[in-house]
């Protein structure tokens, strides 16, 4: 038998109390996918739950440690925020602007903050920060979906597809930001990369161009007196050109520190001279909560060989092919230096550059693209120590749930290569046919690999998301 308690207060559960749902002692052997049978849940609300069981001798266990789920937006009317973007990026102008705009807003938190949540979608991809700290450890979010009707489908004869599909959708993410806020003045910032939304593919054409970047953000601040205050994206936000002056999934990323605005993502900046963000058209896609794994740094690799070449550059071998990037940490630079990382890969290898604005130390890695490489050549600095460089493997955070080992070293090596290759091909909620060239989710490759992936990784939610994309992308 089992008993489930659901409450709005974690501490109440520790006392065996439930203000939402108490299943009572329920006789049965169910242990998986037991349906919630309490009252209808509310949007943007936290629910705590716990469970205890009885064994065959009717001996009861202790209550499990409480766990939490947070509900998202149950209807479009729950969104108070607006889609906004940069005033200088005009969707009617087809030429590609590959820069990454940045936005900010200051707000006040009063006494008695209990909990704060952020619901956010930034297209193509976003990096959110509060009071100088990055929100979450995700990359390449939100995942790729059919955001909206693609203009190129109406005009490009090489793509014989109907522009309408059955279910456009756009994913939003939710973050607990309580510990990032303090009483008084706070600041939130959004940096937008182009991702798959505003993309020039290999040669900067606009075949995949849905429009310029835009975002929607709604923060809910809950107080001990029961009040809820909202901080939302609207035209009161300020905008600027970010130091990410070039952001392209296929062609790389360039960061120019001369465009940094000190204190941009912290309270107290005088931004009165900056222009305001503008309203942008919302994608046709329904805003839907992200339910799949996001991309994260999965592994950090130290060099297995490190060599200074005759031309003064540094050739580094990290021991295996990964999808990710090289991270430079604490490198001594001079004003005007341009640090370059050439991730040795098949075309398109992609640019990776950092322009230095002053003398000092620099720590840097890309944000809105990945590279496929084992070796890299690093240049632009006078000296580089092996301790100042690592490679970070980045991919969808699907946990391995099976292992393989046998007496044949060749078979073991093949399995390791396959496992790494599969992880390298899982980005932004889809599985690609190759992570370095096309970077697109061809279903033929995905269907063949899926049984093997599901046997080796906890990837059910990953494929649920992707197959949902496929289902919704059919013509009516």
Q: Residues of each region from the PLM?
A:
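Well-ordered alpha-helical scaffold segments within catalytic/enzyme domains
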Residues: 448-459
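HEAT/HEAT-like alpha-solenoid repeats
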Residues: 471-475
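Active-site lumenal/periplasmic loops and adjacent helix-entry segments of GT-C-fold
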Residues: 439
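Extracellular/oxidizing-compartment recognition motifs
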Residues: 1-46, 50-436, 444-445, 461-466, ...
């Amino acid at each position: 038998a089992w008993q489930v308690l659901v409450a709005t207060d974690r501490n109440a559960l520790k006392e065996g109390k439930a203000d939402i749902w108490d299943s009572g002692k329920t006789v049965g052997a169910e242990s998986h996918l037991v349906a919630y049978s309490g009252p209808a849940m509310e949007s943007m609300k936290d629910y705590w739950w716990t469970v205890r069981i009885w064994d065959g001798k009717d001996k009861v266990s202790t209550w499990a440690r409480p766990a939490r789920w947070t509900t998202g937006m149950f209807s479009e009317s729950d969104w108070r925020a607006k889609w906004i973007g940069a005033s200088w990026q005009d969707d009617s102008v087809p030429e590609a602007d590959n820069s990454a705009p940045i936005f900010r807003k200051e707000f006040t938190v009063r006494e008695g903050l209990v909990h704060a949540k952020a619901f956010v979608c930034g297209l193509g991809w976003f990096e959110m920060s509060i009071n100088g700290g990055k929100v979450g450890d995700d990359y390449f979010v939100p995942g790729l979906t059919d955001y909206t009707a693609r203009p190129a489908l109406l005009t490009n004869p090489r793509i014989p597809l109907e522009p309408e599909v059955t279910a456009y959708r756009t994913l939003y993410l939710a973050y607990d930001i309580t510990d990032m806020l303090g009483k008084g003045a706070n600041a939130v910032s959004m940096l937008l990369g182009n991702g798959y939304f505003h993309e020039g593919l290999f040669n900067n054409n606009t075949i995949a161009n849905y429009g310029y970047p835009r975002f929607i953000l709604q923060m809910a601040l809950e107080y001990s007196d029961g009040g809820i205050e909202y901080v939302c994206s609207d035209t009161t936000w300020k905008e600027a050109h970010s130091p990410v002056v070039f952001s392209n999934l296929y062609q790389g990323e360039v960061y120019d520190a001369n465009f940094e605005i000190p204190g941009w993502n912290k309270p107290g900046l005088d931004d009165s001279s900056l222009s305001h963000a503008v309203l942008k058209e919302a994608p046709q896609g329904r805003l839907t909560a992200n339910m799949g794994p996001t991309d994260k740094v999965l592994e950090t690799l130290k060099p297995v060989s490190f060599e200074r070449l005759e031309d003064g550059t540094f050739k580094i071998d990290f021991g295996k092919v990964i999808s990710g990037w090289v991270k430079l940490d604490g490198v001594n630079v001079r004003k005007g230096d341009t640090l370059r990382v050439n991730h040795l890969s098949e075309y398109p290898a992609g640019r990776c550059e950092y322009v230095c604005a002053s003398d000092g130390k620099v720590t840097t890695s890309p944000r809105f693209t990945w590279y496929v490489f084992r070796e890299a050549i690093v240049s632009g600095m006078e000296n580089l120590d092996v301790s100042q460089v690592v490679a970070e493997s980045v991919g969808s955070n699907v946990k391995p749930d099976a292992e393989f080992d046998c007496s044949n070293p060749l078979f073991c090596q093949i399995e390791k290569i396959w496992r790494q290759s599969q992880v390298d091909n899982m980005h932004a909620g889809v599985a690609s046919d190759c992570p370095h060239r096309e970077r697109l989710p061809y279903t033929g490759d995905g269907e063949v690999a899926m049984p093997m992936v599901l046997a080796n990784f906890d990837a059910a939610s990953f494929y649920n998301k992707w197959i949902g994309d496929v289902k919704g992308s059919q013509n009516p």
